[in-house]
From Swiss-Prot:
Listed Pfam families: P-loop_SecA, SEC-C, SecA_DEAD, SecA_PP_bind, SecA_SW
Keywords: ATP-binding, Cell membrane, Cytoplasm, Membrane, Metal-binding, Nucleotide-binding, Protein transport, Translocase, Translocation, Transport, Zinc
Family membership: Belongs to the SecA family.
Gene3D superfamilies listed in its UniProt record: Helical scaffold and wing domains of SecA, P-loop containing nucleotide triphosphate hydrolases, SecA, preprotein cross-linking domain
Topology of the protein relative to the lipid bilayer: Peripheral membrane protein
Location(s) in or outside the cell: Cell membrane; Cytoplasm
The organism of origin for this protein: Bacillus cereus (strain G9842)
Recorded GO MF terms: ATP binding; metal ion binding; protein-exporting ATPase activity
Cofactor binding description: May bind 1 zinc ion per subunit.
The protein, known as: Protein translocase subunit SecA
Reaction(s) this enzyme catalyzes, per UniProt: ATP + H2O + cellular proteinSide 1 = ADP + phosphate + cellular proteinSide 2
Region annotation (Disordered) ranges: 788-807
PROSITE patterns attached to this UniProt entry: SECA, SECA_MOTOR_DEAD
Organismal lineage: Bacteria, Bacillati, Bacillota, Bacilli, Bacillales
Amino acid sequence: MIGILKKVFDVNQRQIKRMQKTVEQIDALESSIKPLTDEQLKGKTLEFKERLTKGETVDDLLPEAFAVVREAATRVLGMRPYGVQLMGGIALHEGNISEMKTGEGKTLTSTLPVYLNALTGKGVHVVTVNEYLAQRDANEMGQLHEFLGLTVGINLNSMSREEKQEAYAADITYSTNNELGFDYLRDNMVLYKEQCVQRPLHFAIIDEVDSILVDEARTPLIISGQAQKSTELYMFANAFVRTLENEKEYSFDVKTKNVMLTEDGITKAEKAFHIENLFDLKHVALLHHINQGLRAHVVMHRDTDYVVQEGEIVIVDQFTGRLMKGRRYSEGLHQAIEAKEGVEIQNESMTLATITFQNYFRMYEKLSGMTGTAKTEEEEFRNIYNMNVIVIPTNKPIIRDDRADLIFKSMEGKFNAVVEDIVNRHKQGQPVLVGTVAIETSELISKMLTRKGVRHNILNAKNHAREADIIAEAGMKGAVTIATNMAGRGTDIKLGDDVKIFGLAVIGTERHESRRIDNQLRGRAGRQGDPGVTQFYLSMEDELMRRFGSDNMKAMMDRLGMDDSQPIESKMVSRAVESAQKRVEGNNYDARKQLLQYDDVLRQQREVIYKQRQEVMESENLRGIIEGMMKSTVERAVALHTQEEIEEDWNIKGLVDYLNTNLLQEGDVKEEELRRLAPEEMSEPIIAKLIERYNDKEKLMPEEQMREFEKVVVFRVVDTKWTEHIDAMDHLREGIHLRAYGQIDPLREYQMEGFAMFESMVASIEEEISRYIMKAEIEQNLERQEVVQGEAVHPSSDGEEAKKKPVVKGDQVGRNDLCKCGSGKKYKNCCGIVQ
């Protein structure tokens, strides 16, 4: 074990030695940088940018750029970065984590790599845990960057889209992790590229990196929306479908399980819902609900495909006959069956977009972070984010006194001892910080201190601005501050001059399940070589002690006749606690790793959809893409209707009916013509006819209008199907563990089923786009619309509505208007006939 530790330590030492050489280079440049005037110093920024365009790299510029920032910081902020801060900056620039102890100046350290990487013009994001810290750092460090001629932006939750665009366009952007993630998701839901706010993700420096990438790694960011009319529509569609007659108003192909409305059925629907054209883009949702209602009634059979159990629809696995609890049919079929069976239609909020911090931050070209405590999670940072943890030496030696844990028999005895210790230190005038794991504990100690007449502050993470004031007072003479462990991170406790001899006393009321959090609490004392003392009070009734076998120790204390006021101070107990913490940390790491494996399935799918969506937004002409979709749709339809080996069993009539209903007009493709062809030859004449019809449609309107119509269709279909797919993947994920029977690996099942569902969604997108392009009439006031209004599910969401740009279109013939060909018939019964 000692050998391994030594090896790890040696690796860190080698890195420090290597960086020390660069620090010496930076120091050597000081004599040439110091004499420069402010204007000449500013001019260095332009010089560096020019050198980058001529082929130099940011690595080449590092020593000189760091020397420039150091001199500028001295002039503007009155702070001169130490050598150890230069090392921290080098580690950050190289895409690693700088572990720098509390009070060592992480914020100032970050300015060095931020400036250097901002010279590329690609943007640098400085990420903090809350908006107060983002604003503070942007205001303070922004002065330095602006002095050197760089632009600084701050991205807040309350900002408008225009303000966010300005913030992201700056060379350096300060933001919270939540806001960055939500902006990324919102950018992939917009309908016009002018509405996007983010640029490509280049370089991020995360402050308190362990808090964001480890503690919050399992929290997904979700933008959700309510499909409010959905429940009602399913009921209306269900009532309508019950009135339909087989063969006459809908046709059903037993072999392909394909069901669709006939011309009579379409007319009946238009009358029933008082609309002119069921295939109009305005009625996408209605048509979808009718189709799913048809499938629910005609294709899906109770006690064969599903069962009704305790008021819920439960799917039956067609291969094993097992109930697939937790799984729901996608694309609204499940709700249609719920309407059919008269059970409650579940209209839970729909996830429109989701991402975890793990996957968001892994998209950056380069990522780095700073914290006082990262070494214990080094394996996770290396394996998941490809970042090494480099422990930066402190500027002055740490002289803090970390005392061994005191263990009491009961919680009551422990808290009495804690309060007694606080009272004694308070009398001497020593400032005390009390760390608690839970808010209830802090309230209990607060009551006990009030009874003893000790004035104190309670610190929790609810009010960030007030938090900074409390922290500022926490180092004053006789101050007592009770804080939950995470509160106050990012703000230093500075000692008053009259308490420098004592230093700060940090009292922990129990061990956290993570050593890292305990180390953060300890690190509050003894900053920058100040004196200080830390002491943890434990009891046998603490959660960690209860979980990891403290019964023997409790029995031992009973045997020794120890009462509640007598603690034991034992290295053996401290080691047992540490080993328990390591086990919990290991379990938590495994859980985060597993989350990432599951999330990677959706990540790959999300990247495909978002990339294609981006291409659609930027494309001037989608015709080629849509023709490809039509080709795929036709080929799938041909394959589905000709899958039997014997030619007589092919369902050519079903194929022609499908084509007439969804893509072509009656008579475009004849049954007898197709019967003369082999399956691989059938697609060609069908596709040729489709292209001919597409050309006819293009002649009916100006090109600009046709191109916008294509985009409207693609966006509406893709966004609807994708949100339904995310929902289906959510249900699959929830139910997959319930099917871990036999030797089945749930992750592998999730990957396989998720992939099959994604392929099915892509096919469904292609088919629906083809149908709407060929069958829908063009609206007069055509505009792109969001499928559902999204709302960020997080305190820092901004549910800002996307501004839509109307695209005004020319005159179009209504379905019930007289046809312009002069036949005297209504347009829908003449040139606008819909099969």
